[in-house]
Amino acid sequence: MKKIILLIIVAVIGITSTAQEKRMAVVQTSTCYMRLQPDYESALETQELMGTVVEIVGEKGYWREIVSPQPYKAWATEKTLVEMTAEQIEEYEKAPKYLFTAPYGHIRTVPHETGTMITDLVGGDVLRVVEKQKGKVSPSGKHGKWAEVMLPDGRTGWTYKKDLRILGERINIRKGDSSEGLIDGETMEAVITAAQQLRGVPYLWGGMSSKGVDCSGLVRICFLMNDILLPRNASEQVLCGKEIEIDRPDVKGKTQAEVKENYNRDIARNAIKNLVRGDLVFFGNTETGSITHVGIYLGGGEMIHASHLVRVNSLIPGDENYYENAHRIVRACRLCY
């Protein structure tokens, strides 16, 4: 009798353990479109990029409900994911990897422009380094101007090695976190360069890649390209780093139309006088302070942001490239200090 009870207990523990195991997967397409509902017509919530590890928490037909590191919970199709066991995920995470640094590219079957395309790539995608011997990176993994890479599902192919760098350890800055001493001036310049490379990319609600970006997606992908993880949304990005004062007249009780009408060059220059290159600039409701937009300050009264498309605009009324909603500036934060 005791043996039977013991066997039952062991069986129950085994079933419980199996039931509690998380279903994990890795994004295997250049961009994974995460939608509000399991339907192609459903709203795009965000994108995740190749090489990102996600958790599967639901299933409906060929749709998988996933939780990404952003964190976001939404639906993606099974073909954009490679499901892995816990052991496979551990092995994947330990493997040496490349970060794809160009705005856009391809993986081909052979190291030549005539090679058949296996998949496209966008900046921020992560690819495994091809290893021929255990623990050693193969010197034959590079072929002239080409590098051999491995996709999450194990397929291998070739892309330009100039567009790759070894993936470094990433800094995760969450809302409320200080970033003091974590980001230097050189890194911030690289963030700005990444943003400039995306100029002209169309605005896409929920987008976070060279295929389309929204305002906070632009900020997140440019920092991610430089091994810094920021929150996905502007309302959380504003809570990172060090707050910088926006010095402007009290607008309490005034309508947005009144604020816009009274916003002049002197008020604008005074509002941004404390900003330095690389600061994040936030816009929204001047009375409530709610955040609806973000850009990266470039200095000289200009910022780069995603509005209609990725573009550079002035924050000073009267300038030729003046941003029409600059009067809605409400907050700013500094990540490099």
Model-derived features: where do they sit?
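Aromatic- and glycine-rich peptidoglycan recognition patches
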Residues: 83, 109-118, 268-270, 287-337
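Sec-dependent N-terminal signal peptides
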Residues: 4-13
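Short, well-ordered loop/turn sites that connect or cap secondary structure elements
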Residues: 48, 121, 272-275
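...with weaker cross-activation on analogous glycine-rich loops/strands in unrelated enzymes
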Residues: 229-312
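Boundary regions of SH3-family modules and the immediately adjacent low-complexity/disordered segments
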Residues: 20-23, 39, 50-55, 60, ...
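Active-site nucleophilic cysteine motif
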Residues: 195, 207-226, 230-233
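Second-shell loop/turn segments in exported
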Residues: 114, 177-182, 202-210, 284
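Loop/turn positions that initiate beta-strands
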Residues: 51, 122-127, 278
